[in-house]
């Protein structure tokens, strides 16, 4: 009965919740009914607390509907699927060990190299050396915000239960938003949990280079064996596979082999899978088999938190008002923020001056001037009009049809986020509208970004275009 009862609840929750929420928080739950107690198992404490906080009332309501007076009591526990025991490693000769100790990028003609390991610890160290995972990028130094919350939660779940939670996990968004940091954080967490795990991180171009060298050295079988033997494969910027047919063909088979073996795949891209041109449809389809999550430009509070965290790492005191001054003017990505802060700190060290708003304005004058020049209300209006294939005059008009009103609201919200203009100034720029109209538009778009995947995508695309 437990499976059918929970299945009914799942089906109803799937209708009620946004697809991303359902896939991330509810789908991973497992159910067991014993002695009129329904136990829901979450893959980790983070998911358990989130589900209990956000969805407990909905689950209890559905149990009441389906069970009437015989409602089972509800319990939550942290539990994970049993992991199959690893297969015993085949006996290897010293030549085999030496051959496997080189990543495919260095594949050459096979020569027996007599090399022995003192103990298993050396072998593990070698695996970690080959992984290319940056030990500096961990979950504990990743600054969480509304813009990356879902991506961070998914990455944590994958690291706790690789190959089972979400496979593949596909993270997409503009440059410098933290996708690569999350890849490394997952890799580090997997190895922390299991030092014997084979985790490989690489840029997609490295995969292509490895394959080309393997073909040149007649070592394609070694190439296949290397990539298909990993426990987790983390590939950055998958869009660089575009128009590389042979690489796509090989990755297609590698992808299938890893999925069949319950080995984790995490991919990143600068755009949504279906928007990647030059990549075969069968690959784009597979990219969406697991969970696809957008990493968006950080909102103001997150930008401030990032600056404060980086200043702390440098053992520099950064006043709140200074952090807000920088964060309000540099909005596009984390990398830009870090670069600006590094310049400010360097200037302060060279001159011995305290870091004040006036000092920051002087140290970053060229960067701030460029930013103000790039993002103007006029530029926003032109970009939004072009995106929705309407005229700028429509945005300034009194027309209230959905095809014009929604782009106008989006443009107002973008103007509030990307410029330093006040609400009355924004209203004036949109046909002399009142500041309350602008405020309503901003709140409406914020609500729609939570409820509508299309609006969320449009907003992210426009921010990316305006900030590039």
From Swiss-Prot:
A Gene Ontology molecular function term for this protein is:
DNA replication origin binding
Cellular location of this protein?
Answer: Cytoplasm
Q: Which Pfam families match?
A: Bac_DnaA, Bac_DnaA_C, DnaA_N, Hda_lid
Enumerate the residues binding ATP: 176, 178-180
Which keywords label this protein?
ATP-binding, Cytoplasm, DNA replication, DNA-binding, Lipid-binding, Nucleotide-binding
* Protein's UniProt keywords contain DNA-binding: yes
Predominant localisation class: cytoplasm
Q: Where is this region: Domain II?
A: 84-131
Region Domain IV, binds dsDNA, annotated ranges: 349-468
The record's annotation in PROSITE patterns points to:
DNAA
Which GO BP annotation is one of this protein's?
DNA replication initiation
Where in this protein does the record put region Domain III, AAA+ region? 132-348
Give the residue ranges for region: Domain I, interacts with DnaA modulators.
1-84
The record's annotation in InterPro entries points to: AAA+_ATPase (IPR003593), Chromosome_initiator_DnaA (IPR001957), Chromosome_initiator_DnaA-like (IPR020591), Chromosome_initiator_DnaA_CS (IPR018312), DnaA_C (IPR013159), DnaA_dom (IPR013317), DnaA_N_dom (IPR024633), DnaA_N_sf (IPR038454)
Q: Which GO terms describe its cellular component?
A: cytoplasm; plasma membrane
- Chain residue ranges for the region called Disordered: 81-104
Q: Does the keyword Cytoplasm apply?
A: yes
- NCBIfam families assigned: DnaA
- Family from the record: Belongs to the DnaA family.
Quaternary organization: Oligomerizes as a right-handed, spiral filament on DNA at oriC.
- So what does this one do? Plays an essential role in the initiation and regulation of chromosomal replication. ATP-DnaA binds to the origin of replication (oriC) to initiate formation of the DNA replication initiation complex once per cell cycle. Binds the DnaA box (a 9 base pair repeat at the origin) and separates the double-stranded (ds)DNA. Forms a right-handed helical filament on oriC DNA; dsDNA binds to the exterior of the filament while single-stranded (ss)DNA is stabiized in the filament's interior.
Q: What is written about domains in the entry's comments?
A: Domain I is involved in oligomerization and binding regulators, domain II is flexibile and of varying length in different bacteria, domain III forms the AAA+ region, while domain IV binds dsDNA.
Protein known as: Chromosomal replication initiator protein DnaA
List the source organism.
Vibrio campbellii (strain ATCC BAA-1116)
Question: Gene that codes for this?
Answer: dnaA
